[in-house]
Amino acid sequence: MIIDSHCHLYYDSLANDIDNVIQRANDAGVSRLVCVGTNVEESKKCLSITENNDDIFSSSGVHPHDAKDVVDGYIDEIYELMEYESMIAIGEIGLDYFKNHSDPEIQKKVFKELMEVAQDLDKPVIIHSRDADEDLIQIVSEYSSVIGVAHCFSSTLETAQAFLELGYYISFSGNITFNNSHLPEVVKSIPLDRVMVETDSPFLSPEPERGKGNEPSRIVHTVSK
């Protein structure tokens, strides 16, 4: 059984063909999907997709790129979304200093607010970290009762070990298949029962499909790597 632990099914390239996308995933051996929200509105779209698909679950969160756009009361909306049974996690949340679409201080504020929601609801988190490992690990360590997954992991073995020590899982996506990727060496040092896989579709198509739109069925290339 393969679970695509992180995909964004509300993008038009997937949502407009959702039945066939799900069928191709099932044909490839993918039995469960997690549709991950990156802001309140997209989290609502994830929820809508799960209503007619028992094998799809969803999460609600605010991506660090979207942290600058949160409005008063957004936390209340997250709480309301998390009342639905199919909403299984808070995410995706975290820090991204690579592009800095949101000021780092705003990112940290929103990240902490959402970690507090996860702590309050006893829900796992889906973590996004890019060029922000030191700050992110520090914040995560402040919420010792919260566990989750470091999604689309692309950092060092040392960072992976820091996540593992905090009780987190490490999820690998199509970038592990890229030429000259260091990630095949990283994954060798991680206990198999702490490894997860994902597509992050419609992004990050694995080799040999790199450069094309991604979808859950292509997770088989990541698994085989």
What are these regions (language model features)?
Residues 1-225:
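Mid-domain alpha/beta scaffold segments of enzyme catalytic cores
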